[in-house]
């Protein structure tokens, strides 16, 4: 899988950058509320809500916060959020996709466009870069949940398209149409996953020099720090030395 380790490193770096728990919990709560509002407030009957709750648990979000976010969806004063996808090119021509939940799309667009302009990139139209990514479901388990062989066998039997296992855990990929069924089958064998989500996975990655890489990582940090930006994906690789230098 081209660029897989880099893809993981950059996503994990995002997790560490988001370690300001209040901001992270706010984003998780927003996704929980939106998921509950779009479907039933019962995670067992609402796959998107279940995935959001799993993500919140993985970050040790308190149970009270999770329940409050679910209840918020049914309140008369429940906020309304638009689900948007922004796409653009960062420094070095790297493709970037952002998933956004916002109560003010004009503000979100203005802020994101400003970030791209200041970084030397440009915000494009929807569809301008997403063709370079695959829309996939990913299911993640800790490494100690199963052996490599057992996870591979179970995932293939469940209908997964690909499995990547290393010391960091198991990542199982499936199409967006089947991944929830795959997740359900794996849960019956290995218990609850640490992550179940739809992602944009780059088909190929671009190796960039450290100067460009630093600009890109700063752009991604800016985007991730924005309250409305839920997820950021990009198709580049940087050196391990740069990741280490920047504390990643």
Swiss-Prot record:
Keyword terms, alphabetized: Cytoplasm, DNA-binding, Transcription, Transcription regulation
GO CC annotations on file: cytosol
Keyword Transcription regulation: yes
Primary location recorded for the protein, binned into one broad class: cytoplasm
Gene Ontology terms, MF aspect: DNA binding
InterPro entries the record matches: Integrase-like_N, TACO1_YebC-like_2nd/3rd_dom, TACO1_YebC_N, Transcrip_reg_TACO1-like, Transcrip_reg_TACO1-like_dom3, YebC-like
Organism domain of life: Bacteria
GO biological process, alphabetically ordered: regulation of DNA-templated transcription
Subcellular location: Cytoplasm
Region of interest (Disordered), ranges: 1-21
Transmembrane residue ranges: none
Pfam families attached to this UniProt entry: TACO1_YebC_N, Transcrip_reg
Keyword Cytoplasm carried by entry: yes
HAMAP family: Transcrip_reg_TACO1
Similarity comment text for this entry: Belongs to the TACO1 family.
NCBIfam families registered for this protein in UniProt: PRK00110.1, PRK12378.1, YebC/PmpR family DNA-binding transcriptional regulator
PANTHER family in UniProt: TRANSCRIPTIONAL REGULATORY PROTEIN YEBC-RELATED, TRANSLATIONAL ACTIVATOR OF CYTOCHROME C OXIDASE 1
Protein name: Probable transcriptional regulatory protein Nwi_2729
Organism (species): Nitrobacter winogradskyi (strain ATCC 25391 / DSM 10237 / CIP 104748 / NCIMB 11846 / Nb-255)
